[in-house]
Amino acid sequence: MRRGECVLLCGRSGMGKTTVTKLINGLIPQFEPGVERTGEVEVCGFDPARCAMHELARHVGSVFQNPKSQFFNLTSNDELAFGLEAAGVDADAIEERIRATVGALHVEHLLDRGVTKMSGGEKQSLVFASVDVMDPDVYVLDEPTANLDARAIRVLHDQIAAILARGKTVIVAEHRLYFVADLIDRAVLIEGGRVAREFSPEDLRALSEEERARLGLRAVDPAVAMAVTCPAAPACATGALERGLSLRGFASLRKKRRVFAPVSFDVPRGAVVGVTGANGVGKSTLVRAMAGLERATEGELRFDGAPLDARARRRRCSLVMQDVNHQLFSDSVRGECELSAAGVDAARVDEVLAALDLEHLEACHPMALSGGQKQRLAVACALLAGWEVLLLDEPTSGLDFGHMVEVSRLVKGLAERDICIVVVTHDCEFLSRSCDFAYELEAG
């Protein structure tokens, strides 16, 4: 890569895109025990394997797949200042650089906030801001849009364009190709840990839908990627549904602050219902409250006409969290599935593992999987558990086209077994393929 170039790393989940980014930022081999590097890597004149990390960090800034893995502070302001303080920058200069960065990124609403209370998308935006404030020469972005809403993606696109205009170098490992298609100089397809093909921006846009699907690539045209074609949600019934979920005036307060406003909607048995909305409006808190993991302070939730308190909701509902690292406990992929599938025969476990392209990984430790593979494993566990209500929070985060389609097929197949499914997602392709209708959650 030349200075000032923007290169996209694309391809199916688990093919080695994140590994390439770790070679560039020095995490391999410096922070990956047992991993050996052969060959040569040079970044800004340094070999990342032999350069002190604090020195390399002046030149290379990284945004990881899981934003929580790179926070060092409890508040957003401290997080933004952390790298500059470690580099010995003057306090007045730190304040000025933070002010300029949050203004350019339009993330002023993230200042003076507790990091742990932010939504997944807000955390992603904060991580990018904490990297940008350091003004590195090279930006390494691993799935930077995984948890972002449409507005935040547009802001990120414009900021990458501004970074490139300053002569910076950008490497993006990403499945959402549409948001960088007009910024890149070339795209590199990674398959099986090797460079399989390279595309110019024109060649990438010229790929047919069949060719993209064969390569595991998502839509390149924003008009296709952002189109939502599922029907509008029907009006709420006067009373609770006789068969399905009914929320009436359902709301949550946290420290006297309303996390999401009272909501009322229905999820019939056999339906897949989408929930969309901007980052931070309370979508994840809503499904956590529906699952009995967060306190609901107003309204009620009924299932098949009967009210459910928090304990009853925990018995009826299965939640696949946005950060699936919180719900992987076993020491193998198969063990994880069997933990969730008490009473399910081995053939059914084999079937689900094969459907989600995990059968070749069944002996692997869940924490050794890529982000997309972990996501598919969490979905597999939920499918095997046999709950009556399935809640999915960003289930396609980090998934390539083929695996997104497979999750969609399995979710729709599960709905046919007469269960209720709610999907929180920013993924318009998945929403259009999977949901019978959708609700949009707004602040207030």
Functional labels for PLM-detected ranges:
Residues 92-110, 346-361:
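Conserved ABC ATPase "signature" region
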Residues 40-55, 300-313:
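ABC ATPase NBD Q-loop/coupling interface
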Residues 139-142, 390-393:
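Catalytic Walker B motif of ABC-type/P-loop ATPase nucleotide-binding domains
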Residues 25, 291:
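Helix-to-loop junction immediately C-terminal to a conserved catalytic motif
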Residues 114-118, 122, 365-369, 373:
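Conserved ABC ATPase signature
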Residues 10-12, 276-278:
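The feature captures the beta-strand-to-loop junction immediately N-terminal to the Walker
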Residues 174-175, 425-426:
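H-loop/switch region of ABC-family ATPase nucleotide-binding domains
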